[in-house]
Regions:
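Structured catalytic/nucleic-acid-binding cores of DNA maintenance enzymes
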Residues: 1-308
C-alpha cells in the first residue's frame, strides 16, 4: 500500500504537472471506486473543473478544484495514478467481446503511435478504474488491479468530513515530541500496531513503521505506553527521518507502487530492515528477523531492538 512518502511524492509530481489544467470529463469503468457522491452526480459535477492545487493528508491525495470542490483519492493496496500524454486511445471492445475479462482488466489504453511513448508505461495499459480527460488531451488514469482504491468528490467545506478520523500529520506544526507522547499514553497495544493506526499518526504504514522503530531501537512488540521519554524522542526523530528519506528517493516500490510517469521508487535500495530478513543488521551484524504481527510482516533486529 502506498504510504505517506509515496503519496507525497505523487502529489508533488501532480502539482507540477496538472495545476492549471481543466478536467473535461471523467470516465468511470468500475463504479465502486467512486465512494462519494453516486456515479451520475460525480460525472456531472467533475466536468469542466479547473485544477487549483494538489495536496496530501495522511495517505489521501487531495485535488482542489474551482467552484469550491475537491477530489479525494485513497489508493489503498494497489492504486496508482498515471499521467498519459495526448494521443493515447481507449479500447473498450473487451466489454462486449469478453465481459469476464472486462470485469477484471477494464479497458486498454494504447498510444496511437506505438514507437513514441513518453513515459515508462507499457504499450498496452489495463486495470484503469477511472480516467480523467484533460482539455489539453492528456489523460490522468487511476489504475488499481485489486479495486480497493476509492475516489470522492466533495464540497470544500466538507473536507473534514471526507477525511474524518485521521490522526497527527507528520511534518505539520502539530506533530511534536509532546504530541506523540500524548498520543501513545494509555495505549497498551504493541507499538508497531499503534503506529499503523491512522487515527494516531496519519500516513504511516508497514514499511515506514518498521524503519522508524529500527531507527529508534525499539522492539515492535513493546507496549506503546511503556516507552521512555528518550525512546519517544528517538521515535519522533525516526518517523521524520524515514519519511523524509522515502520522499527524497521517490517512494518504495517492492510490488505495485509506481509514480506519475510509471517509474518505480528507489527507496527500496535504502530500507534497513523492511523485507531484509536474514540479512545482517547494518549496526551490529545480527541477522534481521521477520515475525507476523496483526497479520502483517514485521521486521527488526533482535539485538538492537530488544524486547526487555
Amino acid at each position: 500500500m502506498p504510504e505517506l512518502p509515496e503519496v507525497e511524492y505523487t502529489a508533488r509530481q501532480l502539482r507540477g504537472a496538472i495545476v492549471g489544467a481543466t478536467i473535461s470529463e471523467a470516465l468511470v469503468f468500475w463504479e465502486r471506486t467512486i465512494d462519494h457522491p453516486d456515479v451520475p452526480n460525480f460525472l456531472a459535477e467533475i466536468a469542466d473543473r479547473r485544477i487549483l492545487d494538489v495536496r496530501r493528508r495522511g495517505k489521501f491525495l487531495i485535488i482542489d478544484l474551482d467552484g469550491e470542490v475537491l477530489l479525494t483519492i485513497h489508493r489503498r493496496m494497489t492504486g496508482n495514478l498515471l499521467l498519459l500524454p495526448p494521443g493515447w486511445e481507449i479500447d473498450t471492445n473487451l466489454k462486449t467481446t469478453d465481459p469476464v475479462a472486462w470485469n477484471i482488466k477494464g479497458p486498454s489504453f494504447r498510444p496511437w503511435n506505438t514507437e513514441d511513448t513518453t513515459n515508462a508505461a507499457a504499450t498496452d495499459l489495463f486495470y484503469c478504474r477511472v480516467c480523467f480527460n484533460l482539455v489539453d488531451g492528456r489523460r490522468l488514469l487511476f489504475i488499481d488491479t485489486r479495486k480497493f482504491g476509492r475516489i470522492g468528490l466533495w464540497p470544500s467545506k466538507r473536507e473534514q468530513e471526507a477525511l474524518e478520523g485521521l490522526g497527527l500529520e507528520p511534518f505539520s506544526d502539530e506533530f511534536t515530541v509532546e504530541a506523540l507522547a500524548k498520543a501513545l499514553a494509555g495505549r497498551k497495544g504493541a507499538i508497531k500496531q499503534v503506529l499503523l493506526d491512522q487515527g494516531v499518526i496519519a500516513g504511516l504504514g508497514n514499511i515506514y513503521a518498521d524503519e522508524a522503530l529500527y531507527y529508534a531501537a525499539i522492539h515492535p512488540l513493546r507496549h506503546a505506553n511503556s516507552l521512555t521519554p528518550d525512546e519517544i524522542q528517538r521515535l519522533y526523530e525516526g518517523i521524520i527521518s524515514v519519511l523524509t528519506l522515502g520522499i527524497e528517493h521517490g517512494g518504495t516500490s517492492f510490488s505495485e507502487y509506481r509514480d506519475l510517469w510509471g517509474e518505480a521508487g528507489d527507496n527500496y535500495n535504502h530500507v534497513r530492515v523492511y523485507h531484509q530478513q536474514g540479512k545482517p543488521c547494518d549496526r551490529c551484524g545480527t541477522p534481521i528477523e521477520r515475525i507476523v504481527l496483526g497479520q502483517r510482516s514485521t521486521h527488526f533486529c533482535p539485538t538492537c531492538q530488544k524486547l526487555t
